[in-house]
């Protein structure tokens, strides 16, 4: 048996993405994956030209992904089954990665209650792109983890429907602007 890892998107809408990650270990080594969650792969991710990354521009030209995609950790449920003092580290990817969460045992974090969402603290740092990595320490044969993480997508990096229905978002040419710029002159 070899170490086995899974990645499953449970929900991906205009505001949130929920992802399930698992890892089962055979004792042959640790997980060291700097891009376990790729931020530009989610529904509505915008390209440098303002179109969705997944589509092509008029004329069939491929879109270029942004260099960074903003996510905030909204909720987290985890279970790390380990016979030693092993742990799982989730981090925000950058040249100098920043720890998002250290996981050991089981627990949850919920930014929906009195807690706040946890933003990516690598924004503006060298090599920051919004991706999330997973690294383990001390995992041996028959150890495992399950993580279910919900992230909030930041508006400036993901489409919320403003291109399909600009009037609903008060975007031009349907936007209402104070001072008469929209022809109402009041």
Task: Map each language-model feature to its residues.
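Short, intrinsically disordered N-terminal pre-domain segments
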Residues: 1-27, 182-186
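Active-site-proximal loop/hinge segments that shape catalytic or ion-binding/gating pockets
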Residues: 36-38
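An anionic, turn-rich surface loop/hairpin at beta-sheet edges
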Residues: 98-120
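Beta-rich globular "head" domains
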Residues: 41-87
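Mixed-charge, glycine-accented linear interaction segment located at domain edges/termini
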Residues: 140-186
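Short, surface-exposed beta-strand/strand-loop-strand elements in extracellular ectodomains
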Residues: 82-105
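Short, surface-exposed beta-strand/loop "edge" segments at domain boundaries and coil↔beta transitions
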Residues: 24-34, 84-86, 98-99, 136-149
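Noncatalytic modules at the cell exterior or secretory-pathway interfaces
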Residues: 117-146, 150-156
